[in-house]
Amino acid sequence: MKKEEKKENKKREQNQISSKKWNEWLAGLIDGAGKFTLSKSGYANLDILLELRDEKCHIELKQRFGGEIKRKETTLIRYRVHRLYGIRQLIACVNGHIRHPLRKIEFKEICMHYNVEYKEPETLTFANGWLSGYFDAVGLIEFSTEQDQLYLAFRHKKNTMLNELEIQKCLGVNLTCEQNGCSCESVTLYKINKKTVLSLYKYFKKYRLRSSIKTTQILLIPQFYEIQNETKEINDMQVKQKLWKQFFKKWYVDEMVKYESVKLANYYKSKTSPEKRVKKLIKLKFHRNERIRKRAERLELQKEKEKKA
């Protein structure tokens, strides 16, 4: 009996930890891409606007809180929850985790409306899943083959937002904005050193991202540094370019195929359910991966022929 009790206690602890991580991730996602509103008739709403390729995030939210998913533009989808049961559940999940100054004002108003005590968030650290949700919403990792440099990018209207949200303090570094064309369409690039990148890599392995392309890029970070070290010893520019080109295809594979905005947009016009659209998305990804695999096989055959010659 004691063994069974211990197992049950362990399961409960694991469930509590995983639910806490998920709540922190959700708060980060809302801070980056969400908005709380209170209508004149006294109904609370939460809207979260993401790119079409991140529809799986919305489906996960719909399964937990109800609500609806609608296409906003060609490449954007909106999740909305407004029913009382879903809103109350959501308040319980994110209370004590909301950090964005505007979201805090909106969320306080919602809490007051439903007579819920508002909780202030704790200091942001690497032992918190908030950053993964915020990164899913507005974060990017870019790289420059010319400088062999990785950049952290955020879609911010204000360059001071990293300080306001304590992200710099959490990372333990002072991020400096790139001067030459650093802001383009409200995307700001920040130079990051290898130590910070690898600590982010470890963090995102513990607090996983839900965005497919960002997850792919995070997993490719060690390979980036492998190629960086390899190209230092190579003098032939053509060989260097070839290595970076192959890596570039892996890094931006979803962008190059462009199945998200074009093919999935057509499915939104029909009355198919979100679950069916995700199945179609998986099929499209499978065909994409097959093309990549066949391309890799052709490259290997070419290399073998070159060696024999």
Curated annotation (Swiss-Prot):
InterPro entries: Homing_endonucl. Gene3D superfamilies: Homing endonucleases. Its EC number is 3.1.-.-. GO terms for cellular component: mitochondrion. It is found in: Mitochondrion. Keywords: Endonuclease, Hydrolase, Intron homing, Mitochondrion, Nuclease. One of its GO terms (molecular function) is DNA endonuclease activity. This is Intron-encoded DNA endonuclease ai2a. The keyword NADP does not apply. Mitochondrial DNA endonuclease involved in intron homing. Cleaves only one strand of intronless DNA sequence at the site which coincides with the I-SceII cleavage recognition site. It is an enzyme of class 3 (hydrolase). The expression of ai2a in E.coli causes growth inhibition and degradation of genomic DNA. Belongs to the LAGLIDADG endonuclease family. GO terms for biological process: intron homing. The lineage of its organism: Eukaryota, Amoebozoa, Evosea, Eumycetozoa, Dictyostelia.
